[in-house]
Structures are given as C-alpha cells and as structure tokens.
Amino acid sequence: VRRGFKVYQLNPTDLTASIAYNPLDAASTFPEMQEIAHILVRTATKGTKVDPFWLQGAEEILGILIKCLKSHPDATKYANLANLQYLLQAFGDGTPLTPFVAATAPDDATYHAYKGFISQADKTKQKEHSQAKDSLAVLADPDIARLTSANSFDFASLRREKTALFLVFPQNRVSYYSLLANLFYTQLFHHCLDDRAYRPDSLPIYFLLDEFGHLTIPDFPAIITTTRQRRISLSIVLQSTSQLV
C-alpha cells in the first residue's frame, strides 16, 4: 500500500476481506464456457483413474447447463456455480430440466445436445451425471457458494494501475480450494494474453505461482510460450520436480 499498490485478495476463509469471483460471469463464448466444464471435471478427478468416456459425458452436461444459465434473461443473478449445482441436483432422469433447457438454450444445437444426453441408456446417463455432480461437491460449502455468486474484481485493472492480488488459501487445505485457484488462474491468464486487453503501454504482470503442483491449468505449456510477448513474468514454486510431470 505504501508503494502505491491497490491490494486485493481472493480469500474463501474471510469473505469480508475477499473479492467476489464468479467464473461464469467471465465466460462469454462457448469455448470459455466449455473450458469451465473441463476444469470442474478435471480438478475433481486429478490423481484418479477414470474412464475418459465418463469425463467427456460429465463435461458435456456441465457445458450444456452453463450455456443455458448464461442465456437466462437474468443471467447476472442466476448464472453461477451454486445454481449449476442446483440444476444437477434437480436432474433426476433429465426430464425435470427439459422445460428449463427449452426456455434458455442459446441455440437449437444446445437444446438437441441436451435431448441427446438424456436419451442415453439410464446407466450411462446416471454415471455421467454423477461425475458432473461430484465435480461441484465443494459448492456444498456455503462460503464458496457465496464467494462465487458475484464478481467484484476487474482483471483489466491489473494492466491499468499498480495492483497486488493475493490468492489466500490455508496451507493444509490447498487441495480443497484448488478448484477456485484453477478457474481463477485460467481465466486470468486468458485475459492477460488477449490481444484486445493488451497495449504496448500496459503495465507488466508478475505471477508467483506457489503450490503449483496443486494446480490444473489447461494448456499451460502454450500459455508459457506466449507470456513474454505480453510482458508477463512467471515464477513457479514446486515441492518436488515430480510435480512437473
């Protein structure tokens, strides 16, 4: 603060001091929405062996429901992870959600994708649905549900003004909060590398990625190769070189 920095923190254990962060709010394109589905599923299954078929099915239904929430007439209020979890809990055999999907699907392809999903064999459908629901288990924590229900931090401010942003998680619960970290870092990297958000006079950004071994950031090697062109510096902290694998 004394050096002229604005200081913020993402802190799920102290909501009064934390910024609010809704990952669905930052997703405006179908690929960005599907990437959220991918991160949800891959974070929940990291370190476990699950048939890719079930993972793909879980990502599919999550992606469909995210698109519907984002297309809701009052998306600012309803498009968040807690409501995504609510939809999965109300899924049943799929038919209870059909009116919602029919009313909010952004296009015919999304609606027909949902109809195709619920027309699968019951065992297949329920296994994929269960995998999707498990990926949102952390939303049972009311503090995480509340923190991710709104957005209060503008990524663009990092390029405009001197800013220090801390992700604050208890050391003994880093894995528990890894979903928040994975979503936040992924979306922040995408913003920082976006040509539309960068100008030659933009402020540089320095990332210190502590406990990197707990993170699951899609296409991170590709991100590394393009950071220098956008005046981004990365420092990665690992407990062991085996975490690079």
Protein language model regions, located:
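Sensor-1/coupling segment of RecA-like P-loop NTPase cores
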Residues: 227-245
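P-loop NTPase motor domains
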Residues: 1-232
